[in-house]
UniProtKB/Swiss-Prot annotation:
HAMAP family: EFP
One GO CC term, this protein: cytosol
InterPro entries: Elong-fact-P_C, NA-bd_OB-fold, Rib_uL2_dom2, Transl_elong_fac_P/YeiP, Transl_elong_KOW-like, Transl_elong_p-like_YeiP, Transl_elong_P/YeiP_cen, Transl_elong_P/YeiP_CS
This protein's name: Elongation factor P-like protein
Biological processes annotated in GO: peptide biosynthetic process
The gene coding this protein: yeiP
GO MF: translation elongation factor activity
Lineage, broadest ranks: Bacteria, Pseudomonadati, Pseudomonadota, Gammaproteobacteria, Enterobacterales
One Pfam family recorded for the sequence: EFP_N
Protein family (similarity comment): Belongs to the elongation factor P family.
Length: 190
């Protein structure tokens, strides 16, 4: 079994009789000598969908669950439900809008390549996105000529409604690459 310091976002823990999907990890370094590093983890309870927060020391042993990952394509929206189709056997996987609320901020209309669903023991757990996505800038302050030398940023609204900081020289209509986990601009899209 792994230690708490080996846990990554997207893993599932079996903790206190609950299946918890890791959504976010904050590492709190000790200020006193001899103190242990604390890992504050935010989870989503797989069965109930509730948000859970727990703290672990770096050397705490945790019980992880082995997941099955299947590549999927976005298929369609049915009211409040989003349906994804398995690329190999065309099995439909259905998520409610609340279950994948954060993922939808990065998903362009029509979906994106390399999306995966995570299942355990036949139970649908989560939708996992690739590391990067290319999105179009819909709204931002106009680009300033000669601003490429400065390192200043400005907010930009993307085609999915997500707002991130981009360099000043970018203008509406340009496609940019976003790092999903860090929510940051990486560069212009190819």
């Amino acid at each position: 079994m792994p230690r708490a310091n080996e846990i990554k976002k997207g893993m599932v823990l079996n903790y206190n009789g609950k299946l918890l999907l890791v959504k976010d990890i904050d590492i709190q370094s000790p200020t006193a000598r001899g103190a242990a590093t604390l890992y504050k983890m935010r989870f989503s309870d797989v069965r109930t969908g509730l948000k859970v927060e727990e703290r672990f020391k770096g050397d705490d042993i945790v019980d992880t669950v082995t997941l099955t990952r299947r590549y999927v394509d976005f298929s369609y929206v049915d009211g409040n439900e989003y349906v994804f189709m398995d690329k190999e056997d065309y099995t439909p996987y259905t998520f409610t809008k609340d279950q994948i609320e954060e993922e939808l901020m990065f998903m362009p209309e029509g979906g994106m390549p390399d999306m995966q669903v995570l299942t355990w023991d036949g139970q649908l757990l989560a939708l996992e996105l690739p590391q990067t996505v290319d999105l179009e800038i819909i709204e931002t302050a106009p680009g300033i000529k000669g601003a490429s030398a400065s390192a200043r940023n400005k907010p930009a609204t993307l085609s999915t409604g997500l707002v991130i900081q981009v360099p000043e020289y970018l203008s509406p209509g340009e496609k940019i690459r976003i790092h999903i986990e860090e929510r940051r601009y990486m560069g212009r899209a190819d």
